[in-house]
Design a protein with these regions (language model features):
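Sec-dependent signal peptide recognition
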Residues: 2-9
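C-terminal motif of bacterial Sec signal peptides marking the signal peptidase cleavage site
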Residues: 14-17
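Start-of-domain marker
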Residues: 20-82
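General structural signal for secondary-structure boundaries
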Residues: 30, 96-97, 106-116, 167-172
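Short, low-complexity, polar/charged sequence segments that are solvent-exposed and flexible
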Residues: 51-59, 81-84, 104-105, 113-114, ...
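An acidic-aromatic
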Residues: 61-111
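Non-transmembrane domains of secretory- and envelope-associated proteins
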Residues: 89, 125-177
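Charged, gly/pro-rich active-site loop segments
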Residues: 108-133
Length: 177
């Protein structure tokens, strides 16, 4: 019996370790809340900041950027037809419709592309990093997100900003190119 126990334990370990590997597949979710580190490279300058991403599947995506001390300074709200960029520090915003993106950015983003970017498949306990590059006129823009924490189906109704408190401006005033 003393000889048989190590053999049975070894066989048990071998069978337990021979399970099929599961690929990182997107989870079926209605809402997604995650924390991330966003790195933005604009031409030769690079910026890195904390971010919070909230996704209501096929409805709304809210990206909140907190460059320092966890204070939200910039927010982007993407819906199926447009993206609203909000500069909270200067109380101003701009609305960009996806058909206007084709004139500004190559490749032109869509709601589906943004949703896939921020809800990339994730393996448990492993940081997920997604990257995307764009060209905006003569400028090259690269965005990388390292997602560190995810919670599925925990969000209630979206908390959108009341834009009455903000002044609508052109994109060039928010992003001087």
């Amino acid at each position: 019996m003393k000889r048989l126990f190590p053999i049975i334990a070894l066989c048990g370990l071998l069978f337990a370790s021979c399970s099929t590997q599961r690929s990182a597949e997107p989870r079926r979710y209605q809402t997604l809340h995650q924390k991330a580190t966003v790195t933005l490279q604009f031409d030769q300058r690079q910026y890195s900041m904390a971010a919070t991403v909230q996704v209501w599947r096929n409805e709304l995506i809210i990206l909140s950027l907190q460059p320092m001390l966890g204070i939200e300074m910039v927010r982007a709200e993407a819906t199926k037809d447009s993206v609203i960029l909000i500069d909270k520090m200067n109380r101003r915003y701009t609305v960009l419709h996806y058909d206007n993106f084709q004139k500004l950015v190559t490749p032109a983003p869509s709601y589906r592309l943004i949703q896939d970017f921020v809800s990339a498949p994730q393996k448990p306990n492993i940081k997920t990093k997604t990257e995307q590059s764009f060209e905006m006129g003569n400028h090259k823009i690269a965005i990388a997100c390292s997602f560190t924490q995810r919670e599925y189906n925990t969000l209630k109704s979206p908390k959108r900003l009341d834009l009455k408190k903000y002044k609508q401006v052109s994109l060039r005033e928010i992003l001087p190119l």
